[in-house]
Amino acid sequence: MKTLASTFLGLLLVAMTTVVAIARADAAAGKEVFQGSDCQSCHYTQGPATEKSIDDQLAKKGPELWYAGSKFQGPWLQAWLQDPQPIRPMKFNSVMEPNPGGHPALSADQAGPVTDYLMSLTSDAVKAGTVKVKKKNLKGRLIFIKKMPCSGCHQFPTKKKFSGGLSGPSLVGAGQRLNPDWVLAYLQQPKVFKPVKMMPVFVGLLSDKDMKNVAAHVATFK
């Protein structure tokens, strides 16, 4: 019996090692495609964040991706890379100029490896399984709409279509796009991800429980 158990554990270890090796190979292939497509000219992938001033932020051409694997959901990311639609109503780093769109699209053969690469880029600040998502989170909804001015800057889905402001990234479809654990980490430790930003800091204004409710509410957005 001990021999059988040892054999099983050995095979399991080999299988796990093989899976990890394949994942690393896929990520490495994706990195080559990412760099070969010149994606790094607009998106930096080396963390942690180094911006110290508004000039540093304005020098960026596009969102940083060094924590993409903690922020995004893989299936959404792979689909978006093949058919990229604007997430921000306004151009990156602007609150006045509309987003013209036109983000380069990848082929299906390119999008898979690039997704593997981007999903390998994670932040230790994001703890998995922290946010419990339900179909409805009334406390989170009240905070999002009434207690804090989230809807003043972010579009979000409503029964009619969508509502909210235009200056921040749209949250329409956030339930499929964003990892709720990252949303919570971003609310709790915003400077880890964006040392210089326009979004208000809610640390000290909202409790951790409130932030969890907001993250859970955002996760319901379709």
Residue ranges and their predicted role:
Residues A25-G47, V133-P157:
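Sequence/structural segment immediately N-terminal to covalent heme-attachment motifs in c-type
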Residues K31, Y44-A79, Q155-Y186:
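Gly/Gly-Pro-rich "capping" loops immediately C-terminal to redox-active cysteine motifs
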Residues S41, S107-G129:
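Short, structured interface segments
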Residues M1-L12:
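Bacterial N-terminal signal peptides that target proteins for export
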Residues V14-A23:
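C-terminal segment of classical bacterial N-terminal signal peptides
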Residues I54-S70, Q82-G112, G129-K132, G165-G173, ...:
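Axial heme c-ligation environment in periplasmic c-type cytochrome domains
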